[in-house]
Amino acid sequence: MSKYWSNITKDIEPYVCGEQPKNKKIIKLNTNENPYPPSPKVLQAIKNAAKDDLRLYPDPNCDVLRKTIANYYNLSKEEVFIGNGSDEVLSLSFLTFFNPEETIVFSDISYSFYPVYANLYKLDYKLAKLREDFSIDIEDFKNARGGAVITNPNAPTGLYLSLDSIKQILEDNINKVVMVDEAYIDFGGESSVSLIKDYPNLLVIQTLSKSRSLAGMRIGFALGQKELIEGLNRIKNSFNSYTIDRISSLAAIEAIKDEEYFKECTLKVIKTRNWTINELGKIGFKIIPSKANFIFITHDTYEAEDIFIKLRDENVLVRYFNKDRISNYLRVSIGSKEEMEIFIDKIKKIINKL
């Protein structure tokens, strides 16, 4: 700790991201990345973008990308906001729509960046306790004084909340913003985007990191009625007008446009997820129903931390959370079929020795 730090810097507990190993031989199932490369059209766009106009600033409004996303979701360009990954979009959204004197609500088991944002911006928040099966009780989100944040599908559980439940939360908080974080929506859930026209308090946040294989380029976006997007732009332009560079913008456009490749990759992930769930069930694991590109697993006989350590020793990384209620669970990202076959083989050998 330095005497030059501000009080906020001294007090804040930063988010801890998943391990990014340098060893390329490690099977990486800990950060929910896509096991398949970006679309070939994306890679070609990146090559084509490497030219002398990189000396110029990019379009601060990302107009072409916004129009591409708007067309994809049948929205107007004015209903799309672009940011440097969905983490930045979420952070700016917390600052744009939530007030320090009004308590916001999000689940006790959810994306662990939410309390970091709340503490950074001095926001009061209430943790809505998930049920024993990790499902959401929507009554806990009723009449939230400051607004609400829903992760759908939830992370790290993978559970999906129906659109009817989302509608109820929106109606119960009609005078406050409800953010729906849909980072994993493309792996089996139904997006809330269709509700935007009817709910001026709905902000849907998505990313190209997961289903579009662009985690390395940091592209996220928010979708909502234009008054919400105008507010986000006011805050963004008080920090950094140029959040997306030229190359990332062009890559994102091609990723959105290549629907055939997108569907092919997401279908492979879903099929591999279902295969993995079946194989783990054969050896006694309990798996929370998942609509994401990861699964949340536990075993009545073996400790999650022990399995986590043994897998790491075998060069397989998964995510372990040493937290209340989930300390005996592992979150396992869905890799390629070949990677998951190795994972299953390793975990069988490990539990046979424990």
Swiss-Prot record:
UniProt EC number: 2.6.1.9
Pfam families found in the cross-reference section: Aminotran_1_2
Xref: PROSITE patterns: AA_TRANSFER_CLASS_2 (PS00599)
InterPro entries documented for this protein: Aminotrans_II_pyridoxalP_BS (IPR001917), Aminotransferase_I/II_large (IPR004839), HisP_aminotrans (IPR005861), HistidinolP_aminotransfase (IPR050106), PyrdxlP-dep_Trfase (IPR015424), PyrdxlP-dep_Trfase_major (IPR015421), PyrdxlP-dep_Trfase_small (IPR015422)
Catalytic reactions of this protein: L-histidinol phosphate + 2-oxoglutarate = 3-(imidazol-4-yl)-2-oxopropyl phosphate + L-glutamate
Coiled-coil regions listed in the entry: none
Keywords noted in UniProt: Amino-acid biosynthesis, Aminotransferase, Histidine biosynthesis, Pyridoxal phosphate, Transferase
Domain of life: Bacteria
Pathway: Amino-acid biosynthesis; L-histidine biosynthesis; L-histidine from 5-phospho-alpha-D-ribose 1-diphosphate: step 7/9
Family membership noted in the UniProt record: Belongs to the class-II pyridoxal-phosphate-dependent aminotransferase family. Histidinol-phosphate aminotransferase subfamily.
The protein, known as: Histidinol-phosphate aminotransferase
Gene name, Swiss-Prot/TrEMBL: hisC
